[in-house]
């Protein structure tokens, strides 16, 4: 297991349920549905999905759910507020190490295109990995939902799509708007009422509670809405996504338990 800054233990992973075949995701909605599904698991689980394309190439989707524990003192479960604080401060964190180890254990190849998808805290982890894994893996795209990632960089060669709800204040916790860059698109949806607005426009707040506004399943529904959105910026993300998902692919999914293990002195 990997520790902060190297070997030691924090962020270790273990197989949870082995591998299973399932239908391959076909778009943004399917990807976020998987993230929401993993968030309902009984433990701190991340998913690594292998997509075997008809031409013999392979793509990978890495799914990272959100925070499970409000604990500020680091415990065994790394999906906690201690990880949030580390991510916000730019410090090493157990989740980033754990997801990287899950990718290594799953067999992700250095040249295989990878999509990193995450909800809330998981989106911060995915965005950090887009930078930290440069030179180790080929990160093609990042998909976040309800995540405060405005102050986090995304490398020029990575295409990112950020989903937010107008009534959800969690994406604003870092105090920084998402950059308006050629490789980064933000879609903000106002709940309820459907429809989506591109690049940070907010269509007026409606009285939805934070529970709904910050729900992983609500974001999965928003992702499905965005799938139907006609916009050049979203089309750019779809092109990157297609390079990972392929067409007519065969999917094999693995799930990994992630734990914060005390480093050995």
Identify the meaning behind each predicted range.
Residues 128, 132:
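Active-site signature of alpha/beta-hydrolase-fold catalytic machinery across serine-
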Residues 1-6, 14-112, 134-265:
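Alpha/beta hydrolase fold serine-hydrolase catalytic domain that processes acyl esters and thioesters
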């Amino acid at each position: 297991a990997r520790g902060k800054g190297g070997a030691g233990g924090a962020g270790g992973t273990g197989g949870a349920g082995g591998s299973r075949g399932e239908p391959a995701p076909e778009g943004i909605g399917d990807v976020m549905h998987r993230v929401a599904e993993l968030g309902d698991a009984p433990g701190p689980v991340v998913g690594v999905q292998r997509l075997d394309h008809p031409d013999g190439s392979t793509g990978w989707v890495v799914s990272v759910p959100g925070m499970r524990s409000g604990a500020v003192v680091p415990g065994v479960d790394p999906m906690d507020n201690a990880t949030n604080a580390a991510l916000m401060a730019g410090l090493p964190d157990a989740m980033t190490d754990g997801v990287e180890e899950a990718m290594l254990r799953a067999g992700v190849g250095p040249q295989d295109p990878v999509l990193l998808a995450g909800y809330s805290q998981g989106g911060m982890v995915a965005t950090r990995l887009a930078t930290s894994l440069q030179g180790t893996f080929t990160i093609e795209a990042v998909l976040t939902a309800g995540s405060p990632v405005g102050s986090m960089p995304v490398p020029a060669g990575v295409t990112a799509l950020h989903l937010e709800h107008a009534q959800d204040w969690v994406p604003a916790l870092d105090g920084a708007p998402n950059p308006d860059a050629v490789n980064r698109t933000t879609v903000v949806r106002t709940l309820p009422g459907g429809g989506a607005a591109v690049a940070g426009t907010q269509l007026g707040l409606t009285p939805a509670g934070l529970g709904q506004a910050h729900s992983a399943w609500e974001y999965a529904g928003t992702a499905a809405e965005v799938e139907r959105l006609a916009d050049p910026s979203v089309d750019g993300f779809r092109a990157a996504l297609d390079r990972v998902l392929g067409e007519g692919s065969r999917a094999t999914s693995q799930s990994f338990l992630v734990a914060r293990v005390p480093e050995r002195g």
